[in-house]
A protein has these predicted regions:
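Soluble metallo-hydrolase cores and metallopeptidase-like ectodomains found primarily
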Residues: 1-30, 53
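Acidic/histidine-rich catalytic neighborhood of metal-dependent amide-processing enzymes
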Residues: 28-111
Length: 111
């Protein structure tokens, strides 16, 4: 187990509402996930395959999250609108897979 680590995160969920779609009639329909959550997960699965072949000296933790894009839609008028975003990340931050976990976090977006 390497003490030097990086953590790579991706989420597989998508928005249940296309509330930012230019066409207002789509605002209450779900977003298809192939190029949202699924693309990041696919990229991390390929990284995992390559890491397994190369066996780097650096420890690489791949963490897949859910409920990241569940945030309240634009048309929501209730309280606590921000609390519904990044639920998987919030949970993981409070309950890491290893007590005292410490890694360099790598941020990258796939659009």
């Amino acid at each position: 187990e390497s003490k030097k680590r990086i953590a790579l995160f991706a989420h597989w969920d998508t928005r249940p509402w296309a509330d930012n779609d230019p066409d207002e009639k789509n605002h209450k329909t779900p977003i298809l996930g192939a190029n949202d959550g699924a693309s990041g997960v696919g990229a991390l699965l390929e990284i995992a395959r390559l890491v397994n072949q190369q066996q780097p000296e650096l420890g690489i933790d791949i963490i897949l999250l859910d409920a990241e894009d569940y945030g309240a839609p634009q048309f929501y008028t209730g309280k606590h609108k921000e609390e519904f975003w990044c639920l998987g990340s919030q949970y993981w931050a409070r309950n890491p897979h290893v007590q005292g976990y410490n890694a360099r976090l790598v941020s990258c977006s796939i659009w």
